[in-house]
Structure formats: C-alpha cells, structure tokens
Amino acid sequence: MDSSFTITPRFSIKLLEKALRLYTPSLAERPMAEFLADKCDDLGFENVRIDEVGNLIATIGSGSPRVLLCGHMDTVPGKVKVRKEGDYLYGRGASDAKAPLMAMLLAASTVHRNNGTIIFVGAVDEEGNATGIKNLAKQKLDIDYAVFGEPSGITQVTIAYKGRIAINLKVNVGD
C-alpha cells in the first residue's frame, strides 16, 4: 500500500473478520502467521519473517524508542461461526486476542511515522505452553518498551500481573 493509504473502520473490521475466520488453535497458527506476513508486507513493514517456532516478527520505522507490540495468534480449540450483529463482531478469538493483535498491527503501520521503531510480533502457543514468547525471550530483542495485547479488563491499563516463579537455587559456600 502506498503511504497515502488511510486505514478506515471498514478496512479494520474486514481485516479482523478475515483473521477470525482462520482456525488457529495452539500449535496450528501457521495460517495466521502467513496472513499477518502478507498484511505486514502490504502495510510497509520490513524484515517480515516467521521464526523457527512459528512467531510472526516484523519491524517498521527506525531509531528510538524501540517498542515491542506483541499479541498471540492462537485460540482455545473449538470453532465458533463468525458473525456480525450491529456494531459487534463475534468469533473464536474476537477478544482473546485477535482483535488486540489486529489493532496493534494497524497502529504500528501508522504510529512509526512519529519516529522510532515498532517490532510487531504475533506469538504462538499462548493458550498452551507459551512456546512463542519463550522463543522470543531467547532472541534478546533490543527494546525500550513492550505492550502485550491481552484482554485484562476494560476500565484501565494493566501494568503487571501477579504471577509465580519457582526457583531451585543451590549455593556452594565452600568448606
């Protein structure tokens, strides 16, 4: 698409509708990764690639800050017919998390014009064993900020999650 292309609400809705029609349970996200790769190419992203575990990774813009926009491509298993009712679009993954992923894709395609680099990632296996994000962490991306498009509430931005880490620590104190 040329730089004068304007992202319209109709374009955005059609993009999400196409994404929702792709059946992408954990570890079967390849159709979504290929769909996103094509859209990234169309929207002017650079270095568009699908990594060894199936994550879609693309960059746009240059310089600082370097912002990661990451969402997951997989859904829980089971097919749900895509349908539109009034202003609402329903389908497997509509909120968790294909809509946030499409929103970040479209935002990245325009916001980079304000300077900086956007690294857009569609991660695999979030609903399973987090294969995608684990592989992404190993790549040690040079980023300043990260935004994860995961539905966590509608009244405020989620800063962090409570979590759990299990560590097996052995300390050798000598003799």
Where are the model-predicted features located?
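N-terminal helical capping/dimerization or prosegment-like subdomains
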Residues: 1-68
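Active-site/binding-pocket entry motifs
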Residues: 75-76, 153, 175
